[in-house]
């Protein structure tokens, strides 16, 4: 695939702000994963502890084909106990989706990871999630996010961030909290528009950063 059609992003958020649910919906609505063929919820939580606790411990990756682009997504831990796993993948992406709860706003872990992203020169797309909750206060949360970025020493470019409002559970997103589309198209389109393509030298010798590996307990000897 043409590298100009690639988008590499990481999703960072505090625990329980809806990160894994958002990835589930993006996979389903893009056609990458058909709901009727799913055997389990929480697609990106692959081990038993993650499913039981409802959190992401190890960095996972998946890819979405959207229109003529391929979006590579790394779903990183949002729990403070696994913060090192978050930092590990930030050097492998070109932008981040900062997912923030529409009631709680930015949390301490959000601050830590966002600072690491800024230090690496990454520009965020802010997704304010759960705007369908009765107690949601998205405009207050947006102000809190801006103040956080400013306090972290964000550049003018990083402060000029794009905001998407969403209800990941229901699969809706939009540019205003009271004007959501019927699906996640606004978010997917914004990723392809705002996230830069990888900056690589295609004439250089092959090199890569490995961020996921796995092993099979059994192999086919037939």
Model-based region annotation:
Residues 1-100, 104-106, 113-114, 144:
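P-loop NTPase switch module centered on the Walker A-proximal segment
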Residues 93-95, 120-124, 159-161:
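Short glycine-/polar-rich loops that comprise or flank the Walker A/P-loop
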Residues 97, 117, 167:
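Conserved phosphate-binding elements of NTP-dependent enzyme cores
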Residues 102-155:
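Conserved C-terminal guanine-recognition region of P-loop GTPase G domains, centered on the G4
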Residues 135-192:
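Canonical P-loop GTPase G-domain recognition
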Residues 202-210:
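Glycine/charge-rich, flexible interdomain linkers and switch-proximal surface loops
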Residues 211-218:
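Conserved small/polar residues in nucleotide/adenosyl-binding loops
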